[in-house]
Amino acid sequence: MELAYLVRLLEHNKFERTNLPLSSPLVVHGIAGSGKSTILTTFHHHYPAHPIFSHSPTLLDPSNRIYQQCITTDSVPDGAIVDEYNYKALDYSRCLALFGDPLQLPHSLQPHYYSSRTHRYGPKLTSLLNDLFHLSITSLAPVDSLDYADPFAVDPSGFTIADEEVYNFVSQQVPGTLLPLDTVGLEYSSVSFYCSDLRHCVVLRPLSSLHGSHPRQGQPHHFRFLCQV
């Protein structure tokens, strides 16, 4: 009954069925903004006995104070749902379902359902990601903003993320700067991202990088984008 309800939620939110035969646990992949959190929140309202775990827990429903639970051991309870499961390879065989974003993290399994539709990334960022990663993301957001800037002339706006190659330099200038993998499961409406060479960065770390042009190696390059949350 619980699994049937979860499948109805996935289909209602336009998640597509793959050719992989259904098995346990159910594996669901969706990019950021595809509706994973909405599905998890709705499911939890109907079946609160099924805990929702994550390696980086977030607040699912502020009005009802519904939090994800943190995975603190290598053992996950029977019937649990795990969000961002691919953050760490564990034995998830007793879980009801696994949710993850295959663009952000390794350890991904073959999915039973997936969605490449996003309400978060606007047309500009979507075009950028499709070009970089050879994807087919469909943007449902009305508008976004993407700017390339001189890192030595323009201050960052919003939240600051830096690739490993320039992280030490940027974090000294901008306290609170995070590495890409430290932002898994988090949402920001405005982000400044720094790297030395984004296309080179994508080749080396394809699951934790975005896009860029080709500045001099070792010199940080800065771009900013605004998106829906």
Segments (PLM) and residue ranges:
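The feature marks helicase ATPase cores and/or their adjacent C-terminal helical subdomains
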Residues: 1-229
